Curated annotation (Swiss-Prot):
This is Protein SlyX homolog. It comes from Shewanella woodyi (strain ATCC 51908 / MS32). Disulfide bonds: none annotated. Belongs to the SlyX family. It holds the Pfam family SlyX. InterPro entries: SlyX (IPR007236). It comes from the Bacteria. The gene is slyX.
Length: 70
């Protein structure tokens, strides 16, 4: 009977450790989710800024005439 009590106690300790680990991992997932949301917001802002930039008045490489020595 004492062996059964020891096994139950071991299982309870393992369960408590697993619950603690799950709580820690859950907090990490929440932090990473918040970080991802912030990065997505920053990316949307950056894309918006890039789209609003005036195009350059310089010709593209395909539009450039070759130098005279060609």
């Amino acid at each position: 009977m004492e062996q059964l009590a020891q096994r139950v106690e071991d299982l309870e300790m393992k369960l408590a450790f697993q619950e603690s680990t799950i709580d820690v991992l859950d907090q990490q997932v929440i932090k990473l989710n918040d970080l991802l949301a912030e990065q997505q917001h920053q990316l949307r802002v950056l894309i918006s800024k890039l789209q609003s930039v005036e195009p350059s008045n310089m010709a593209t490489q395909a539009e450039e005439t070759p130098p005279p020595h060609y």
